[in-house]
UniProtKB/Swiss-Prot annotation:
Free-text note regarding domains: Has three domains with a flexible linker between the domains II and III and assumes an 'L' shape. Domain III is highly mobile and contacts RuvB.
Region (Domain I): 1-64
The protein, known as: Holliday junction branch migration complex subunit RuvA
Lineage of source species: Bacteria, Pseudomonadati, Pseudomonadota, Betaproteobacteria, Burkholderiales
Biological function: The RuvA-RuvB-RuvC complex processes Holliday junction (HJ) DNA during genetic recombination and DNA repair, while the RuvA-RuvB complex plays an important role in the rescue of blocked DNA replication forks via replication fork reversal (RFR). RuvA specifically binds to HJ cruciform DNA, conferring on it an open structure. The RuvB hexamer acts as an ATP-dependent pump, pulling dsDNA into and through the RuvAB complex. HJ branch migration allows RuvC to scan DNA until it finds its consensus sequence, where it cleaves and resolves the cruciform DNA.
Source organism of this protein record: Albidiferax ferrireducens (strain ATCC BAA-621 / DSM 15236 / T118)
Amino acid sequence: MIGKLSGTLDDKNPPQVIVDCHGVGYEVLVPMSTFYNLPELGARVSLLTHFVVREDAQILYGFATSQERAAFRELIKISGVGPRTALSVLSGMSVAELAQAVTLQEGGRLIKVPGIGKKTAERLLLELKGKLGPDIGVAASVANDSQADILQALLALGYSDKEAAAALKALPSDVGVSEGIRLALRALGK
């Protein structure tokens, strides 16, 4: 319903901000990653939003990027994860870190987020697999362009994100593309 707010930043009190849009102040809850990147009070601000209507409240959640909003929307689709928990997850880690944790099945990273226990972390890993954008999690762990090319080659050959990431970790960081692909294929063939 309300997809974006643009106006003047009137107040900042984590995790809530107030955005004045032509005399109407909207209370918006934002993840800490967005909060830390907000301008000073009185400056222009633009937030992508997700509007939640409940029986007892109407709440706006705001995000600096479309990736954050998309991740939030994927998180709240999961049973047992509401908007507050989704906001907590995005406050505890970036979208790229979340995608990497899901791709590499690292539940321990999710458990460190307040409000996420072992069962919820396992559910997140299972239900978010492949839903946070193509290769965003694996790409977050790539150190340089040649490793990115090696990763893309392995994915194009049909290897899963997890297999490709594991093979990439075993390679020296300064390896060339053709040599890296050869070594990765050898490691995956074992």
